[in-house]
Amino acid sequence: MSKYDVIVLGSGPGGYVTAIRASQLGLKTAVIEKESLGGVCLNWGCIPTKALLKSAQVFEYLKHAGDYGLKVSEYDKDFDAVVNRSRNVAEGMSKGVQFLMKKNKIDVISGYGKLKAGKKVDVDGTEYSADYIIIATGARSRELPSLAQDGKKVIGYRKAMTLEKQPKKLIIVGSGAIGVEFAYFYNAMGTEVTVVEYMPRIVPVEDEDVSKQLERSFKKSGITIMTSTEVTAVDTSGKGVKATVKTKKGEETLEADIVLSAVGIKTNIENIGLEDVGIVTDRDKILVNDFYQTNIPGYYAIGDVTPGPALAHVASAEGILCVEKIAGHHIEALDYGNIPGCTYCSPEIASVGLTEAQAKEQGINIKVGKFPFSASGKASAGGNTEGFVKVIFDAKYGEWLGCHMVGAGVTDMIAEAVLGRKLETTGHEVLKTVHPHPTMSEAVMEAVADAYDEVIHI
C-alpha cells in the first residue's frame, strides 16, 4: 500500500492548488482524479466559458465596427470553431496542471476515489493511505424535478458549452452567474434568448442597482427577461421544447429549441465513502471547522463541498490555509466577508462586501457613492459607457463596507476594493490615493469622492 503525507481527492482549483502548496511545504502528496486534471473550473467552467465569451465579444465588436470608424464588409461566425477554440483553451490549461504536478513531484492517481476508515482511500480496488486526506470533489449542475435534464433538449452548463448546433431559440432557467453568462454568449451569437428567474430580479445576490443595470443592458440587447416566474413543466415530445411557466398573471407556454437549466449546483459528496468513515454532513455540505477539519481526525474538506461560497478562488484559498495548518503554520481563518464575486457577461459584474440593502438592514449609518462610466473618459474612448461603480462606507468610521461594479472590465478592477477592505482602508484614504488617468479604475476614486460630496466629474 502506497503511503503519503497528504492525499487530495479531486483536482479542481481547490484540489490541485492544495496539492501544490502541500508539496511546497515538504509533504509527500498525491492527487486522485477521475476525469481531467483541473476539475470543472478548468475543463467545464471558469476557463472554457471565458473563451466562449471572448468569441462573443469579438463578434459584437465586428457588428459595431462602424461605431469606431471602421468598415467591415464581410464577417460571420463559425459556431463549431468557437466551441472548438473553447475546448482547446480548456485542454491547454489542463495540460498546464499536469506540468505543475510533475514540477512539484506530486503523484497523480487516475480513477474514482472512495474514502475508507483508517485514513485510506480506495481507487478502483487499490488502496492508498495518508496522514491527512483532503476532500475537494466539487459540485455539478443541480437538477429540479420539473426540469429534468436529458442532455438533448433540456441541458446543463456542460452541454451548453459543446452543442453541435447553435439553437435559434433558447430558454435559460436561472439568472445567477452561469445563467447570465450563457444568456450574453448565445444572444451575442444570434440566438433568441429568454431568461426565466424565480426571484423578483435577475442576479438576485447582487446589489439591486446592479441587477437593474444588467436587466436594462440585456433588454437593450434583445434578451427577454421574465422575473418572479417559475418553470412548472417541460414538454420535450415535439420537435423542440415547450416550457410551462407560472407568472404573477397566470400560466403561459414558452417554446424553444433548447432549455438550459442554470439553477445552481449540487455537491459531489455521494458515493465517496463519507458514511463509511462517519463524516458529518448537513444539507449536502460537509461540516468543517475554521481550518477545514471534519469531525473525523485526519479528514479535511475544502471548496464547494463545504458551506462557504462555491467559488474557485475560495476553494484555492481554503486549500492553502488547510495544508498550512496541517504543516504547523500559525494561520488566520479566512474572512468570508471579504470574498469578491465576478460574473463575466456583458456588462461584467464584480462585487465585494455588503450591498446597500444589507448595510441598512444591519442598522449602519452609511455613505453611498456612485460614478457612472458614461462620465469616464476611458470608457467613452472605448465605447463602453454602460454601468457604474458603487461604494458603501460606514459614515462614522469610514470603513469600506461594500463595492459593487457593473461595466466593461470590472472583474479586473474589484481587487482594489478587496485589498482596501483587507487593509482596513478608510474612504478618505482611497479618495487621496492618486489613480492613473485615463483608466476605468478612476471610477472607483470618483465613486468614493461622490460618497464624500467631493466628486469632480459628475
What are these regions (language model features)?
Residues 19, 23, 183, 187-188:
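Gly/Ala-rich phosphate-binding loop of Rossmann-like dinucleotide-binding domains
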Residues 151-166, 253-328:
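FAD-site-proximal beta/loop scaffold in flavoenzymes
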Residues 7-35, 47, 51-58, 327-328, ...:
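Flexible, glycine-rich terminal cap/loop adjacent to redox cofactors
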Residues 1-12, 168-176:
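Beta1/beta-strand and adjacent pyrophosphate-binding region of the FAD-binding site
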Residues 14, 38, 178:
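Hydrophobic/small residue at the entry helix of a nucleotide-binding pocket
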